[in-house]
Amino acid sequence: MQELSEINGSIAAVIFKNDENGYAVVRIELDDGQLTTAVGCLPYIAPGEMISAEGSWTTHAQHGRQFKIEQCSRTLPTSPDAIYDYLAGGAVRGIGPATAALIVDKFGDRTLDVLEMQPEKLAQVKGISSNKARDISAGFKKQSGVRRLTEFLCSYGIQPIFALRMFKFYGSSAIEVVHENPYILASAHIGASFAEADSFALSLGIDGDSLNRVCAAVVFELIHNSGNGHCFIPREKLAAATSQLIGVSPELAHEAIDKLSETREIVCDTVAGLEACYLASLYDAETYTAERIKAMCASPAGKGVRVESLIARLERMGGIEYAPMQREAISLAAKSNILIITGGPGTGKTTILKAVLALYDELGLDTYLAAPTGRAAKRMSELCGMEASTIHRMLGAKMSEDGETVIFGKDEDDKLACDAVIIDECSMVDITLMSAILKALKPNCRMLLVGDADQLPSVGPGNVFSDMIRSGVVPTVHLTEIFRQKADSRIVRNAHMINRGEHPDFNENSGDFFRLRRLQGGSCVDTIVELCRRRLPENMKIPSYQIQVLSPSRKGETGTANLNKCLQAALNPPAEGKKEKPFGDVIFRTGDRVIQTKNNYDIVWKGKNGQSGTGVYNGDIGTITDIDTAEESVTVDYEDKTARYGFEMLGEIEHAWALTVHKSQGSEYRAVILALNPGVQMLLTRGVLYTAVTRAKELLIMVGDDSVAHRMIDNHKQSRRYSALRIRLADENS
């Protein structure tokens, strides 16, 4: 092992720094007066700081000899000259060289104490108001707190980004909080791996066989598996996974499960003869959902209507004739509190949805429309001619103060003011969200659930839509007939063939469905870029912003990560006047297409008509319109609203020229280019291909070897999800 070297000196200049991940390149004036370049984890570093660092000397191919810092201690400057350098170098927002000179002239070597302990005195300096003094002090305290926390966690190998998140949620008490519960680092809102949190905990002196450690591992396994779609884990599997994760005996894992069950952090229940272990929140969501749906199915609907005369009137008004299954759906909607409509593309789901809306209107019911994503809600609004919202917005979702859970404003104590609710793209709804919807409904509120059960299941836990259908308890209409206006679409025909396990002729390039191996002389990536940049805009008059590239995976040459880099370079290259912000291994640029990757219930947005609100949701796609380095913010235009992100929030957005198929769920695009990525085998399934094809409205082009598509059709393997909703609905557990 290479022996570490030590250097001591002061920061002479900051060449580069990224406050999101703490990485910095600095020039250090060593104690002997020499200047050297150093790189490493130095969050909020500024000129004038004193530093003592351990690391190793390396030679960079381009930048020459430099010192790679492994660990370090930093102290703030104490002399007036050094304090001036520190403040003038931009260490504290709101203080530039001129203001720094005035402050240091006034307070000398006491300046930093005044900033932290007596900020009101800053108002004695010309040009600094009381409000500005408070803002300056708050910024200084934040940076001091983050620096102390980061140095503490970095000394145990914890990345600076997690220190920044800890400080965001816990402020000045973050060190105390993480000492008390090291495993909070692995919670969803902080995001460190369990291995990192566990290593930190062991370094703090927690015993390897500590029951608290094993309990933390059990909870982690349940949380981790909920992210893979499971509502519960069989007890024996959970004990074995915990034992393997942290190297303890299965007996100790069972003891931890018992302890957690006693305190109801988890719930153990028997499901079809199997002992199932749930996170308490998922158990409550699943059991509530089952009981409420059974009650809706058992209770009679409210006042009726003469369905046949209504259907005849709707047919006359629309100049259409409903098919038998569509008539059945409308009749069922008239007499059911809850109804499911499922079918593939072109089977008339939208026609039924409009008819049911007319039915509810005839009954005098106030109806809300909602969908899981913003794009799906917008499409629903356009198709139905009335406002639809995201489910989260309808329920008034917001994040709890500790950042760990979602709180819904509409619930059992404050119901939605509607008599009926229609949910589209219901295959995307997980058990937690379905439970929240049901809790917000009045006792006699009706519910229509519309979706395609053959698409990919929800990202979150549960198999809600499929379980409800398979239970046989909920009235369900399966639409299978492809209607005349869609029958000529090869997108629709091929989608249904794929869903049945049949193999379309992908060499038949005609109509709205094409397959290209690659353009002559180029790779698959070159072909995709050329289609987006020139071929489709020029030859088919489809602008690039109406084209969506999809790939099964993030990884590989034709994965979304590489495709987005190539598409950004082609569609939005650097240019004079375009602003940029490096973040991690990507560069955000004005004009970039981006997608929100997690629900943010608190971010403020402004609407185009002057209205404002909070919340941008997973799957929302927009365009970067401004990057303000002074305010450290990025502005994203989401068509109907704009939202500003602080630089520390940029981990919530990604480039969106190319999306994974999973990310595209709930959306439709005028043109879809599907990269036949041969990479991750577990993602090459029939469901992924079917979902990708059904995203296209007017044109679908598959790029790559068609053998990949044929393999996907043959692979109908569906990962098992541990969910008991079907069993509970069908009363098979009694």
Model-assigned labels for residue ranges:
Residues F232, R327-I330, S336-N509:
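ASCE P-loop NTPase helicase motor core
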Residues G48-M50, G591, G619:
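Loop/turn positions that initiate beta-strands
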Residues T270-G344, T351:
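Pre-Walker A segment
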Residues K349, A453-T614, T625, E732:
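Conserved helicase motor core of P-loop NTPases
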